[in-house]
């Protein structure tokens, strides 16, 4: 039995004399492997168990310290070379084991990253970050509205609150620098902002949430409907400039989409912004301002922030 304690091996001679080390114990074998992996961390502790041995209780524990191109080793127990499998197999198995460990560590880190992505969507981003497009828009200035039947260009539209609603057709976008809509008042008293996740629809209640999916590239986004329109032929929805960028059809101007009304998310959204539905038609007619208690200031989540939170809940992008 060869026992070596607190013995220093230079990395270069170790590589040069690898044949000599083949005849020694697992101690020197492990040193040889460590020498080939000189970029490992400065302190490593390994236990070579039965995975490398043919006999029961065949193990040895080593502590390696790398300092000034030296490897210092302290062996607690060393066994005879004949109790080991071939050196080549040890090297291959050891390196394979290290590779497996590295893969496991990578997977653990990756799962940790994924776990962080699966955290509550309200915790993934700060309210400040989600509110960057409308930081001062903490109270909804519009009001809840379904509205009466109306007529545009000879066609009658009947606003209503459906239990289930989907529609397929063409979408356009508005809010460009030349169309003059940016900053204008919407059909329910809100203020249009081309940088927010909003849309216009002919008959859905205002405000409500809809999921818009671009049929060309399958990209989706959830928007707040706060205006009426569009009234051009074959157009079923107008989205903001920001929404068009997320859906990737800003340059084309028009794209085929599928829209889906989200009644449950709409109810939750209205509660989040403390917007109450009017209880009777007379009250709704006379009440032009929003019906809500002001949002608590300490959470600092803007109206657009709340819309983004719903998108994040469904793992949808909130930026182009």
UniProtKB/Swiss-Prot annotation:
<dbReference type="InterPro" id="IPR012997">
    <property type="entry name" value="RplA"/>
</dbReference>
<dbReference type="InterPro" id="IPR022438">
    <property type="entry name" value="RPE5"/>
</dbReference>
<dbReference type="GO" id="GO:0000270">
    <property type="term" value="P:peptidoglycan metabolic process"/>
</dbReference>
<protein>
    <recommendedName>
        <fullName>Endolytic peptidoglycan transglycosylase RlpA</fullName>
        <ecNumber>4.2.2.-</ecNumber>
    </recommendedName>
</protein>
<dbReference type="GO" id="GO:0071555">
    <property type="term" value="P:cell wall organization"/>
</dbReference>
<comment type="similarity">
    <text>Belongs to the RlpA family.</text>
</comment>
<dbReference type="InterPro" id="IPR009009">
    <property type="entry name" value="RlpA-like_DPBB"/>
</dbReference>
<dbReference type="InterPro" id="IPR034718">
    <property type="entry name" value="RlpA"/>
</dbReference>
<dbReference type="InterPro" id="IPR036908">
    <property type="entry name" value="RlpA-like_sf"/>
</dbReference>
<comment type="function">
    <text>Lytic transglycosylase with a strong preference for naked glycan strands that lack stem peptides.</text>
</comment>
<keyword id="KW-0961">Cell wall biogenesis/degradation</keyword>
<dbReference type="Pfam" id="PF03330">
    <property type="entry name" value="DPBB_1"/>
</dbReference>
<keyword id="KW-0456">Lyase</keyword>
<dbReference type="GO" id="GO:0008932">
    <property type="term" value="F:lytic endotransglycosylase activity"/>
</dbReference>
């Amino acid at each position: 039995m060869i026992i070596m304690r607190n013995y220093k091996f230079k990395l270069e001679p170790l590589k040069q004399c690898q044949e000599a080390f083949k005849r020694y114990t697992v101690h020197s074998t492990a040193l040889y492997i460590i020498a080939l992996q000189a970029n490992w961390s400065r302190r490593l502790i390994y236990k070579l168990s039965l995975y490398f041995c043919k006999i029961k209780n065949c193990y040895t524990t080593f502590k390696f310290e790398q300092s000034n191109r030296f490897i210092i080793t302290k062996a607690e127990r060393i066994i005879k070379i004949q109790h080991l499998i071939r050196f080549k197999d040890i090297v291959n198995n050891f390196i394979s084991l290290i590779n497996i460990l590295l893969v496991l560590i990578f997977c653990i880190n990756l799962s940790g990253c994924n776990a962080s992505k699966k955290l509550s969507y309200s915790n993934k981003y700060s309210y400040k970050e989600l509110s960057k497009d409308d930081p001062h828009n903490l109270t909804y200035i519009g009001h809840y509205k379904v509205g009466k039947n109306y007529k545009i260009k000879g066609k009658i539209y009947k606003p209503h609150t459906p239990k289930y609603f989907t529609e397929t057709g063409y979408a356009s976008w508005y809010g460009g620098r030349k169309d003059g809509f940016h900053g204008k008042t919407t059909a329910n008293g809100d203020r249009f902002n081309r940088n927010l996740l909003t849309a216009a629809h002919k008959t859905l209640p205002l405000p409500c949430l809809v999921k818009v999916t671009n049929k060309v590239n399958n990209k989706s986004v959830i928007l707040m409907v706060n205006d009426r329109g569009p009234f051009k032929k074959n157009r079923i929805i107008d989205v903001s400039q920001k929404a068009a960028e997320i859906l990737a059809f800003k340059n084309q101007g028009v794209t085929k989409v599928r829209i889906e009304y989200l009644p449950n998310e709409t109810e939750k959204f209205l509660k989040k912004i403390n917007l109450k539905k009017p209880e009777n038609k007379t009250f709704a007619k006379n009440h032009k301002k929003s019906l809500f208690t002001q949002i608590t200031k300490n959470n600092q989540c803007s109206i657009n922030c709340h819309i983004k939170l719903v998108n994040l809940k469904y793992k949808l992008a909130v930026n182009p």
